[in-house]
Amino acid sequence: MGKTSKVKKTKAGSSTGNVQSLPFNTDKGQHILKNPGVVNAIVEKSALKATDTVLEVGPGTGNLTVKMLEVAKTVIACEIDPRMIAEVKKRVMGTPLQNKLQVNGGDVMKMEWPFFDVCVANLPYQISSPFVQKLLLHRPLPRYAVLMFQKEFADRLVARPGDKDYSRLSVNVQLLAKVEMLMKVKRTEFRPPPKVDSAVVRIAPKNPPPPVNFVEWEGLLRLCFMRKNKTLMAIFRLSNVIEVIEDNFRKVCSFKNKPIPKDLNMKKVIEETLTASGYGESRARKMRVEDFLALLLAFNKADIHFLS
């Protein structure tokens, strides 16, 4: 082995920030990008405009923040760690970039979000799923988001029907947005290095969003992906599934003041609806977003709803 050179501490205003002097809390997902080339690539792929207001989550020591401030109109950085807040402010203090930076302290999942055009973030991995959900339900919709995730999570976001990573998450996100893998990032590009590699994904919300009752949509997908390799007919013949659907059916009929047939056979109604829809022998792992939309419509026409 060759000699290991000593790592020099860098000043807070340098291109990499004062990362050596700050202890990082990896339990909170604090892993700082140390490679300027990767930081520059993320900013380049973000295609920011000079008029953009950018929402950044978890700026850390500000490596990505500073580069975005050089391009965008404003960067609103949301950070929960007071030490990191002080560090990112120090990076731009006394420079022309200072007036372009706004730092919001606190938990980004609990705070009210400001208006922003684009979201660019190296996200704490623990909040990946709830953050994406909040992003896609935020109004007004941003133009897009460029987000760093654990590679395993990113693979699920971009998975297509038939892929091993295709899941309820894939369908939910792809209903509301166009998703694209932009680049992969090795774990060694971070300090301290996480246990797994990462990936950068572009999420562009569909605007306007599809006219879907998301409570029902989520209820349907939850059932379909109970056993994503089984046929839908096999899943919807399960007694506990039939029981839930019949309970919802009775609630809907009561709400509509519609009489419930005395000889109601919910299993038969479900089987006939699935057969007529053409999806009875389909498996969730191979169904497209459009297929689930058509299936939900077929069920709704038969007064079958997914309320819980």
From Swiss-Prot:
Belongs to the class I-like SAM-binding methyltransferase superfamily. rRNA adenine N(6)-methyltransferase family. The keyword Nucleus applies. Residues 12-24 have a biased composition (Polar residues). GO terms for molecular function: 18S rRNA (adenine(1779)-N(6)/adenine(1780)-N(6))-dimethyltransferase activity; RNA binding; rRNA (adenine-N6,N6-)-dimethyltransferase activity. CDD domains: AdoMet_MTases. GO terms for biological process: ribosomal small subunit biogenesis; rRNA methylation. InterPro entries: KsgA/Erm, rRNA_Ade_Mease_Trfase_CS, rRNA_Ade_methylase_Trfase_N, rRNA_adenine_dimethylase, SAM-dependent_MTases_sf. This is Probable dimethyladenosine transferase.
